[in-house]
Amino acid sequence: MTKQLVLFCDFDGTITENDNIIAIMKQFAPPEWEALKDDILAERISVQEGVGKMFSLLPSSLKGEIIDFLRRTTRLRAGFREFVAFTKERGIPLYIVSGGIDFFVYPLLEGLIEPERIFCNGSDFSGETIRITWPHACDGECQNGCGCCKPSLLRKLARPDGYHVVIGDSITDLAVAKQADYVMARDFLLQKCQELGLPHAPFATFFDVIDALQRMEVIV
């Protein structure tokens, strides 16, 4: 049976060259955010708890300023536009699964990815400070407090005839990478794929991803 490629692609540090949450915090947050970041990386607190607390340090009134800042400074990784066009031409389902927040993920992907194919955390600006919401929290099979739970989304969106490929770079992509049939990896995720013996290939740009997918189409 021929299998259908299905792609799950991270946003921060994968589609974009930098991590947008870190960029926001460096630009707008008081120094307390650093300790929260360290606690997340050391797994002393969950991603959900840490990200929620970091954004609660920011006044809701900064929303427009933050979006303007990211529009000016965010760079999409080379080849991403061509990669999106490639998936559309070949009819390959592409889902963006992001630990980022809706108020900046949607504007940065506008005109490239249909909103219904983007899965990320939500936001509420009705209070004094920014409150993050979690429309894609962990299902019953995950207790990691992921925030936007990528393993849960893969379980939900997987196809019986699917060959599921995860594209990512960081610790937030590791759990879903373990569930995938194949991983396109860079940075931290690449090291972990090598250590754990996960089926993978490295990438630097999305042109590399296109090349790998073209080879996969022949195999699957």
Swiss-Prot record:
The protein, known as: 2-hydroxy-3-keto-5-methylthiopentenyl-1-phosphate phosphatase
Pathway: Amino-acid biosynthesis; L-methionine biosynthesis via salvage pathway; L-methionine from S-methyl-5-thio-alpha-D-ribose 1-phosphate: step 4/6
Lineage, broadest ranks: Bacteria, Bacillati, Bacillota, Bacilli, Bacillales
Keywords: Amino-acid biosynthesis, Hydrolase, Methionine biosynthesis
One GO molecular-function entry: magnesium ion binding
InterPro entries linked to this entry: HAD-like_SerB, HAD-like_sf, HAD-SF_hydro_IB_MtnX, HAD_hydro_PyrdxlP_Pase-like, HAD_sf
Enzyme Commission numbers on file: 3.1.3.87
Alphabetical list of SUPFAM superfamilies matching this protein: HAD-like
GO BP annotations listed: L-methionine salvage from methylthioadenosine; L-serine biosynthetic process
Taxonomy, superkingdom: Bacteria
PANTHER family: PHOSPHOSERINE PHOSPHATASE, POLYOL PHOSPHATE PHOSPHATASE PYP1
HAMAP family: Salvage_MtnX
Functional note: Dephosphorylates 2-hydroxy-3-keto-5-methylthiopentenyl-1-phosphate (HK-MTPenyl-1-P) yielding 1,2-dihydroxy-3-keto-5-methylthiopentene (DHK-MTPene).
Catalyses which reaction(s): 2-hydroxy-5-methylsulfanyl-3-oxopent-1-enyl phosphate + H2O = 1,2-dihydroxy-5-(methylsulfanyl)pent-1-en-3-one + phosphate
Family (UniProt): Belongs to the HAD-like hydrolase superfamily. MtnX family.
Gene Ontology cellular-component terms listed: cytoplasm
Source organism (scientific name): Geobacillus kaustophilus (strain HTA426)
